[in-house]
């Protein structure tokens, strides 16, 4: 899936996560190398004032990728607010809400619907189909 996304978005794939680099490295292992790590942001390793929903982490990643717009995939209301705030500051971030991960998926889905999230998916594995990307 990552290879297909990289092809679709000209290798401009980065991560903005609340977790730290070591935690992400441990869970993603070799997959992490598929992302532009240099322009990714690992908020656990940053100062607390950058915590979600502060949009500066996403804006920094977008600037590093030389991008004026992005698709931001997340599973929380903080992620949704972060994307909205980035857009308000001139960095168009289309939010894709993932509701099937974690606790209370039905409640999360209802909140995403209530706040007119443009893309709402049960799992990130549905993303290539929604974006009409051929999986490799």
Short names for language-model regions:
Residues 72-119:
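Acidic, Mg2+-coordinating phosphoryl-transfer loop and its flanking beta/alpha structural elements
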Residues 118-127:
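Short acidic-hydrophobic, aromatic-tinged amphipathic segments that line or gate anion-handling sites
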Residues 1-7, 58, 62, 109:
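Short amphipathic alpha-helical segments and helix-helix/interface helices
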Residues 14, 18-71, 77-88:
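Substrate-recognition "cap/lid" segment bordering the active-site pocket of phosphatases
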Residues 41-49, 98-104, 126:
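Short, acidic/turn-prone active-site loops that include or flank metal/cofactor-
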Residues 127-136:
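Short amphipathic alpha-helix with an adjacent loop that forms part of the alpha/beta core around
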Residues 5-9, 32-33, 84-94, 135:
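Alpha-helix termini
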């Amino acid at each position: 899936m990552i290879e297909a996304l990289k092809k679709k978005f000209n290798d401009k794939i980065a991560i903005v996560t609340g977790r730290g680099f070591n935690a992400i490295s441990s869970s993603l292992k070799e997959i992490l190398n598929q992302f532009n790590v240099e322009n990714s942001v690992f908020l656990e390793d940053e100062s607390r004032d950058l915590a979600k929903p502060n949009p500066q982490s996403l804006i920094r990643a977008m600037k590093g990728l030389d991008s004026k717009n992005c698709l931001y995939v997340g599973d929380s209301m903080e992620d949704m607010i972060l994307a909205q705030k980035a857009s308000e500051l001139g960095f168009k971030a289309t939010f894709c809400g993932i509701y099937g991960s974690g606790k209370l998926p039905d409640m999360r889905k209802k909140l995403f619907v209530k706040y007119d999230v443009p893309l709402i998916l049960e799992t990130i594995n549905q993303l290539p189909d929604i974006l009409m990307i051929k999986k490799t």
